[in-house]
Amino acid sequence: MSQDTVAPALPDAPREVVLVTGISGSGKSVALHALEDAGFYCVDNLPPELLPQFLRLEQARTDGAMRRIAVAVDVRSARSLPALLPSLSQLGSEGVKVRAIFLDASTHALVRRFSETRRRHPLSTGAPGEALDQHRALTDAIELERELLADLREASTVLDTSQLRAAQLRAWVRQLVQAPAGALTLVFESFAFKHGVPLDADLVYDVRVLPNPHYIDELRPLTGRDAPVADYLQQQPEVGEMLGQIEAFLVRWLPAFEQDQRAYLTVAIGCTGGQHRSVYFVEQLARRFRDRGATLVRHRELDAL
């Protein structure tokens, strides 16, 4: 189906369609299994141009009972991807809740995973339309894949899996699909700068300039979730000042992000170890914005323990 072709309306369309895509090695199979466990009917590697026809067939086959469907596509369908975004827009105009999740990871993490599994990258022996004997290095294949999927990434909710175990990824995917569709969901994420800035961050705040509970013996083994750490940080004037300024920025600009038709806005707060200050800030911000709509909390370093 070309970009200019619009499929006819789907009779008795599914209630929810989740598209899972992303960089090879980033965890698409794990995410799809998580959706299957959550009650979605899942299809892997469906050619994008067949999505509207597939949904019609499933609705007819199940008498309209198939209400939650997840479809995974990858770079092997690159030549058909231009037709995918118009198809998703068409579904949305028909009242279907459409979510697109794009899994990504750092090149370093991807190279390590391919090395551990000894699998070949799908573009290492040629991109779609290239001769099959055109070999390329793994890092070159990863960068080419990023280029081919750039438009789809821009239109999706991005999830950085670089530091995630499979169990963490499954839990995070379940959280994403449980959040209300159609409204902006705020994601507050703590992280350690020494492990890199999350790839899925929209806004990044650095709280390393604030007093560090790590240097107080009785607070060192605790986290920003614990009352003694929270009490200590609340007593520091600069902590309250920075927290208030971040809150004020979000209050001022959230309406603009909502008008931009974003599904998610990820606010990443970083400190040295991702244990005290960033965790405290995330917990406080999530509490302050909970009444404004859906909020999700993720502590990258703590969740990895």
UniProtKB/Swiss-Prot annotation:
ATP binds at G22, I23, S24, G25, S26, G27, K28, S29. The keyword ATP-binding applies. It holds the Pfam family RapZ-like_N. Keywords: ATP-binding, GTP-binding, Nucleotide-binding. InterPro entries: P-loop_NTPase (IPR027417), RapZ-like (IPR005337), RapZ-like_N (IPR053930), RapZ_C (IPR053931). GTP binds at D74, V75, R76, S77. Disulfide bonds: none annotated. One of its GO terms (molecular function) is GTP binding. The keyword Nucleotide-binding applies. PANTHER family: RNASE ADAPTER PROTEIN RAPZ (PTHR30448:SF0). Displays ATPase and GTPase activities. Belongs to the RapZ-like family. This is Nucleotide-binding protein Mpe_A3336.
